[in-house]
C-alpha cells in the first residue's frame, strides 16, 4: 500500500513518525509525497495544549473531507491517546493508534487492507487497544531497532529520542496523562541508532525527551545522561554535533557539566525549560522553587563553557501570577542574560490542577505580559548576539538561496542554534548542504548572524 505521514507537534513526534515510516517500509509499503497519492494517510497528532488539539482536529477534518473512495485515514499519537473519542468522532477517521502503540502500525494497516466497507455515521473505527497510562506504572520503551527506521532528511540534522513519558507532575501539564511515566531507551539502543544516523550522513544529533536529565533513572543509572553522552562520544566522529534539548535544571549535575565541556561533539548549548522565576508561582506549578539554585547552575555552565548558549521557555499569565511575580520574572531575565527565550501564554487545560486554581489571569493581561517579556528578551538576545561580531564560528550549512540583490547566499546554523526554534547564520556564497565551514561574523540581529566564509 502507498502511505503518507503527516506529523503535528514536537520533534519527539517526528521521531515516532520516522519509526512508523521505517516499520511500514520494511513490510513493502511505499511512502508517497502527498496525501492525494496515498492509500493510507497517517496523522501523528498533537495534544500539547488546546490550540494544538484544535489544529489536529482541523487537519483530520480537512484530510477526511478530501478522501477518495477506498482511501483510509489513521489518527495516531498523542491526541488519539488523550482524547480518543473526540478523534474517533471525526467523520472519515478509519482507525486510531495511541502513543505506545505506534510500533503496531503494520498490524493496523493490515486490518485496513481488507475490502473497504464505507463507515456509517457513529460506527466504531478500527483501533489497537490503548495502553493504560493512568496507573503511573512505567512500561518498557518501545523496542524498535535502527534497522527498521528509514531516516530520510532534508537537512543534515536528526532528532534522537532517548526516553518517552515523564515522572514529573507539573500542575499545568497533561503529558503524563497520555504518555505515562518515563521509559528510557537502553544505552546500547541509543548508541546503535546514533551510529546508524551518522552512517547515513547526519552531522547533528539532537537528543530529545520529555525530561532529558532524568534519563536512565528507570534503568538504575546514576547520572544517566552524563553516562550516555560519554559513550555517545566514543562512537561518533569528533566533528559530529550532539545537542541537548529539554534538560530540566534540577537534573543538571556537576558531572553532566564536566562531560559537556570535555567532548568536542557536545554542543555548548543547553535548552533548559524553567517556566517561571518567582518561588510562589513555581510552587503553584508544582516545580522546584529555588531560583537562586537555577542561577548558580547557569553560572556553573558558563564557567565551564564560556561560549555556551542557554535557551529557556517560560509561561506568562499562570493562575495567580501577580504583577509582582511577573516583574520578578523580568528581573530574573535581566540577571540571567539567557541567549534564547520562548514564552507561552498560559493555556487552561481541563483535567490539570492548574485549571482549578483561583485567580485565573485575564487574557488581555496575559497578552500584555507576553509582549513585555518578549520585548525585554529581544534586547538581551541582541546584546548576546553582538558579542559574536568579528569572531569566527563554525556553521552547518542547511540550504542555499539568494539575497535581494541576487547574490548567492547559504543558510545554516551554528552550535548556538537548535533546528526550527532558534536563529540562523547567513553566509555569502554558495556552499553545499551538510558541510561545516568556518564563518567570520560581520553582522548580528537579535536572532540571526551574517558572515563571510573563511577559506
From Swiss-Prot:
Q: Describe the reaction catalysed, as an equation.
A: L-aspartate(89)-[ribosomal protein uS12]-hydrogen + (sulfur carrier)-SH + AH2 + 2 S-adenosyl-L-methionine = 3-methylsulfanyl-L-aspartate(89)-[ribosomal protein uS12]-hydrogen + (sulfur carrier)-H + 5'-deoxyadenosine + L-methionine + A + S-adenosyl-L-homocysteine + 2 H(+)
Sites where the protein binds [4Fe-4S] cluster 1:
10, 46, 78
The protein's location, in the record's own words, is: Cytoplasm
Q: Which sites bind [4Fe-4S] cluster 2? A: 166, 170, 173
Q: Where is the TRAM domain?
A: 386-455
Q: Would the keyword Iron-sulfur be found if you checked this record's keyword annotation?
A: yes
Q: What is this protein called?
A: Ribosomal protein uS12 methylthiotransferase RimO
- Species of the source: Chloroflexus aurantiacus (strain ATCC 29366 / DSM 635 / J-10-fl)
Amino acid at each position: 500500500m502507498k502511505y503518507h505521514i503527516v506529523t503535528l507537534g514536537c520533534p519527539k513526534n517526528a521521531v515516532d513518525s520516522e519509526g512508523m515510516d521505517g516499520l511500514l517500509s520494511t513490510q513493502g509499503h511505499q511512502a508517497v509525497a502527498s496525501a492525494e497519492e496515498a492509500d493510507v494517510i497517517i496523522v501523528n497528532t498533537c495534544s500539547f495544549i488546546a490550540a494544538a488539539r484544535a489544529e489536529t482536529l482541523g487537519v483530520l477534518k480537512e484530510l477526511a473531507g478530501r478522501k477518495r473512495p477506498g482511501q483510509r485515514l489513521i489518527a495516531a499519537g498523542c491526541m488519539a491517546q488523550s482524547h480518543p473519542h473526540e478523534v474517533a468522532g471525526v467523520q472519515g477517521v478509519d482507525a486510531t493508534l495511541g502513543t505506545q502503540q505506534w510500533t503496531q502500525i503494520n498490524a493496523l494497516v493490515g486490518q485496513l487492507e481488507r475490502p473497504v466497507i464505507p463507515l456509517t455515521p457513529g460506527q466504531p473505527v478500527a483501533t489497537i487497544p490503548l495502553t493504560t497510562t493512568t496507573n503511573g506504572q512505567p512500561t518498557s520503551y518501545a523496542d524498535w531497532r535502527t534497522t527498521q527506521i528509514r531516516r530520510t532528511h532534508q537537512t543534515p540534522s536528526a532528532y534522537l529520542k532517548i526516553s518517552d513519558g515523564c515522572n514529573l507532575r507539573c500542575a499545568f501539564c497533561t503529558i503524563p496523562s497520555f504518555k505515562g511515566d518515563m521509559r528510557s531507551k537502553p544505552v546500547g539502543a541509543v548508541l546503535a541508532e546514533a551510529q546508524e544516523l551518522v552512517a547515513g550522513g547526519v552531522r547533528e544529533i539532537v537528543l530529545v525527551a520529555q525530561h532529558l536529565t532524568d534519563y536512565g533513572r528507570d534503568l538504575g543509572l546514576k547520572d544517566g545522561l552524563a553516562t550516555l553522552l560519554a559513550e555517545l562520544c566514543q562512537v561518533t566522529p569528533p566533528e559530529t554535533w550532539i545537542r541537548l534539548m529539554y534538560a530540566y535544571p534540577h537534573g543538571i549535575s556537576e558531572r553532566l557539566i564536566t562531560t559537556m565541556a570535555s567532548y568536542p561533539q557536545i554542543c555548548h548549548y543547553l535548552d533548559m525549560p524553567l517556566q517561571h522565576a518567582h518561588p510562589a508561582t513555581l510552587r503553584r506549578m508544582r516545580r522546584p522553587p529555588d531560583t537562586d539554585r537555577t542561577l548558580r547552575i547557569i553560572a556553573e555552565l558558563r564557567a565551564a563553557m564560556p561560549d555556551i548558549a542557554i535557551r529557556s521557555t517560560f509561561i506568562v499569565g499562570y493562575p495567580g501570577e501577580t504583577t509582582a511575580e511577573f516583574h520578578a520574572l523580568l528581573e530574573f531575565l535581566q540577571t540571567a542574560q539567557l541567549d534564547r527565550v520562548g514564552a507561552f501564554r498560559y493555556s487552561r487545560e481541563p483535567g490539570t490542577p492548574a485549571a482549578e486554581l483561583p485567580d485565573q489571569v485575564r487574557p488581555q493581561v496575559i497578552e500584555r505580559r507576553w509582549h513585555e517579556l518578549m520585548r525585554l528578551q529581544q534586547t538581551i538576545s541582541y546584546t548576546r548576539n553582538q558579542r559574536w561580531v568579528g569572531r569566527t564560528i563554525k556553521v552547518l550549512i542547511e540550504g542555499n538561496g539568494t539575497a535581494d540583490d541576487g547574490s548567492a547566499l547559504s543558510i545554516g546554523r551554528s552550535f548556538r542554534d537548535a533546528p526550527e526554534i532558534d536563529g540562523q547564520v547567513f553566509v555569502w556564497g554558495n556552499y553545499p548542504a551538510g558541510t561545516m565551514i568556518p564563518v567570520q561574523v560581520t553582522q548580528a540581529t537579535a536572532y540571526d548572524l551574517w558572515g563571510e566564509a573563511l577559506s
